[in-house]
Structure formats: structure tokens, C-alpha cells
Amino acid sequence: MKLNRTLVMWLVPILTASCVFGKDYQVRLEPSIMIPMRDGVKLSTDLYFPAEAKGQLPAVLLRTVYGKNKTFGWSGVHQLLVEQGYVVVIQDVRGRYESEGSYVVAEHRREDSYDTVDWLISQGWSNQKVGSAGCSYLGETQVILAAAKHPNHVAAVPMSAASGFYMPGRAWQSFSGGVFELAQTAGWFAASGSQLFYGPPAHIDRGQWFKTPQSRLFKMAPEVDFAAYLELLSTLPTHSLLERAQLPPSEYKSWITSAPDGKFFRNKDLAKPSDTFNVPSLFMDSWYDYGPAETIEMFKTFQRNAQSEQARNNQFLIIGPGTHCDYTESTDDAIVGARNLGDASLNYSALQLQWYDYWLKGKENAITEMPHIQYYVMGKNQWRNSEVWPLASTNYQKWYLSGKGKAQSRTGDGLLSLNLPDNDSRDSYVYDPADPVPSLGGHTCCTGSDTEAGGYDQSEIELRQDVLVYTSPVLIHGFEVTGELKAVLYVSSSALDTDFTVKLVDVYPTGEAYNIQEGAIRMRYRNSLSDSQLIEPGKIYQVEVALNVTSNYFAGGHKLRVEISSSNFPRWERNLNTGGNNYDETNWKTAQNTIYHSAIYPSHLVLPVIIESQ
């Protein structure tokens, strides 16, 4: 397949016509409309109307857990849509903020979203067409609405919505290889998981109260001292972290104590690979977000399981270089973490407006003529496009680990090459849960703390003796890596259970070592993410570590590097090495962990290298 390098040129005729939007309407708010669900529960909903607009209007629905009163101002596209003649509808989900009912994460969402669309199209102002919008949880609710298949839901733009799609062991992005996503999940439940119900006194009409200005002054989210968050995450046991912080009741404990692929997560109201879909969707995500691989799989599932040719032919995917919900406008100097990724300009608001215009207003424009897949190659700092995934020109290369047994730190002898090791060797290190390898950048969100996502220089971390470092010679020729990554390792441990972590790194000629992707495996889940099985100390096991997905150009003069250790904290919960439940324990053991590399035990990294047409 010849890679198309004219994407930016293709975007110009569409976006320049829409970069300066006329302001056709002012905004008129009808706040806190109580919309009834099929079981009688009412959900509080704000309707933002284009003032003075005549005739029937399309609606764009956002369903949020974060509070509808503040959602409208999160993105300029919401106001833009109203000004262009859309009714923007923002709803508190069941049990949150002004809405009635009990709040349980990932339940009642199909029926509630379906019933909300039913109510919208029953209104006299409706043109019978409803789109959906929003990022993160708001993207997730779009995916659930798509799975509900309401016939009047005609366009979706799920942004950073990977948590809405069930993949074994990655439900709600709470685990990686069986290792709990501690900072992200605890941080989210601390800020947004409260099950305390807010409401006015019984003698005051609920609907009328929420229409008063005074009601919008109340801050209903818990106060979280994130300045002390890292210290809190370091305490044990991990299943009672939020209780010790005296935060409101939430489902956090159920999350951390459930098997990564057990009944608890399987029964959650998430879109599943077996679901069918019938809504044209424009998926957006970022390489440094927590779930680009899940977003890609979701995109492919919407295509594969489409109920009509129209739906199948109108699934689109855009993946940029940023972090979670980082859809900034026309970024010509993209700094992601500390990594400069060049001119990643893309007018996301213009794309969304044209998407809704086509599907909800029937305006003829070129939006459906764009490539079905658009992705940003970091390092090369260029937009590319494709019609298939994996890319047709993918060549999976094995990069082997080798050395003479002293790969501890970047000053050691760990080597990464395309050649099988010519000697029988191994590298060992001591993993101490009391002194874990610190997280620095990476692929996470919602922590509320200083554990920010993105690309950062890992060279200081690579001086630790509990980090094995394998580095290639200086690359003579650069190459692009785009697609799913994995490491195949031969390992042993002195413990009954431990973790192994892997990080792919791009080493610049100036010495900076930027993280590209990372993954982990908890040894008890090496065979099944629903059934744990402890290991035999000293026995050698082959394990696969999924490193999600990326697109990065390793330029000539750079080096390819992989780090291996047993912790990445606080992103991932520390394994205490005891073989116990881990989440309810306060004692730990050190473990001697070993990576083997030889012709018999060929530990290696698998990279999807893109072969460019001459």
C-alpha cells in the first residue's frame, strides 16, 4: 500500500471554508428539564437552544457523570453548535448531581440513553435527528447509545471513548495484563465516583429548585486533596485507599477486588464485540491516551458488525499525538508531556461541525470523502492515512534482547538487535515493593495528581539497578512503527507472584530517552485474566506483554530501547510478591526476578514496522 502523504492538503479545502464561523444564533438555556425514564426515574437535562431559530432543529446529546452545569463550557464546539442552529442537550446520568435514581457505574445506560432520545424526538422543535458528542465518559456513553441502536441516533463522535468498549482484562481501562491501574482508577473514583445523593429538602419541588440560580451555586463533587494524592497511593492496603482519605462511598473497592476478566466486569453495561451497530461514527483518540488499541478495535467492530452498508462505509478514525481528551485547535507546536511533536494542526471543531451538518442537517459536504483512518506519526511529525488496519505494508520485526548478564541500568551491557543471541545469558534484579520504579509520563488519565501523561525523558529512571535496559546500536536508517506492540519474555522469579513491566523508548542523539508505549503482566494472570494461577519459584515461563499501540518514527541517529522491570508506580498497583490477594495486604516481600535471553529462550520485542513504497 502506498502511504498517502497528502492528508493535510486534503483537509485544506474543507477546513479553510469553516475556520471562521458565522454566529447565526445566540444561546438560550432551558435548565434542569426532568426527563422521565421507563422506570419513572427522572434525569435532569439542560437544553441549549439557538435563540430565535425557526422550524425543526437537530439535537446533539451529551450524557455526563461530571455535572451538566459545567460541561457546556468545556469545549468551544458546544457553543459553536448552538450558534450554528443545533440544540445541545446535556444530561446528568442517573444518580449524579441533579438526576434522580441510584448511581452505579456502567449500569442503566442503554435504556436511559434510548429513552432520552425518545423524549427528544417527541418534542415539537425536533427534526427527528439526534447526534451525540463528548469525550472520555461522555464518549463512553455515546458508544453505549450506539449499541442501543435507536433509529433516530444518526451520528456519533466518540472521543477518547475506549472505556466504553469491553475487551477481556481491559474493562473500563482498569487493568493492564492483570495489573490494576491504580492512579487512574483511584483518582477517577475519588473525584467522580461518589454515590452520595444530592437533593433539595422534601418539601421543595425538585424540578423547580434546580431551575433557580441558587441551585447552580452548589458544589456537589467531593473535595479531594490531590496535593497529598501520591502519598495516599503509597499506603496499604490499596482496597481501602479512598476510605482512609474519608471520601464518599463509591464502587472503587469492587473494582480493585474483582478479577480483571471476571463476572463483575462482564456484566457491566459496556459495548461488547458481539453487539451490532447502525450509526455513522467519527472516532477520535490520541497515542498517549490510555486506550488507543481499544478505540481501534471499537472502530473495526462498528465496521464489522454494522447493520447496514451506510453504517459500515461511514466509520472513521482519527488518532493524534496528544493525551486524554487533548483535542486542541490547530496546534502547530504540539508539546506532549515534554516531547515536541511538531505541527499537528487539525481543526477538530470544524470536523465535528461538518460531520453533524452532513448527518443531522443533510448538508452536502466532503466530510465522508475523507480517508477512513487518519493517524499522526510521532517523530516524523506527519499526518498519514489508510483505508485498512493493520496497515497493509506492516512487517512484524523481532528485536532480540541479549547481553552478558549486566543489563542493570542504561550503563550496563543490555543489547537490542535483529539477531538471535549467540550466548546463553540472563539478567536479574531485585524488585522491592517499598522502592518501586516511579511512573514518569505514559498513558494514563484522570489521576488528579502530578502523574501526568505524555512523553518524558526516562534517562534518570534508567540509572536504577532494578531497571534492565536493552539498547540498539545507533540506527543508520530510520523506520516507522505503527500498530500493536508486544514483548515475548522468558522469565522467572523467587516469588509466588510478581509483575513484569516493559517500556518502549526512543533515544535521541542528544541523550533524551522518550517513552513511546508500555505494558505489564501479573504472573498469576499469565494464562487467563479470569482465573489466577501462582507460579513456581525459579521456574522459567514464557509470557507475552501487550504494549497497546502507537505510531512513532525512529529516526536515523536515534536508538531503539526497551526497559524491563517489575513496577511502574503509581500508574500500576505494586505487586507485593506474597502470592496473596495483594489489594488487602500490608506486608510484602522482595523478589529476585530474571529475564532470560538465548537461542533457547529468545526474549524479544515485536514491532510493526511499516515498509514504505519507493
Question: Which sequence ranges carry the predicted segments?
Answer:
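Accessory cap/linker subdomain of secreted extracellular hydrolases
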Residues: 75, 83, 147-149, 155-276
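C-terminal, loop-rich substrate-recognition/catalytic regions characterized by aromatic stacking residues
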Residues: 204, 208-240, 327, 333-614
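N-terminal cap/lid segment of alpha/beta-hydrolase-fold proteins
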Residues: 21-55, 471-477, 531
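Cap/lid segment of the alpha/beta-hydrolase catalytic domain
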Residues: 51-122, 170-172, 178, 328-340, ...
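Short beta-strand/loop motif that positions the catalytic acidic residue
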Residues: 277, 283-285
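Alpha/beta-hydrolase fold nucleophile elbow
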Residues: 125-137
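Active-site-adjacent alpha-helix of alpha/beta-hydrolase-fold enzymes
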Residues: 293-315
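Short glycine-enriched nucleophile-adjacent loop
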Residues: 139-150
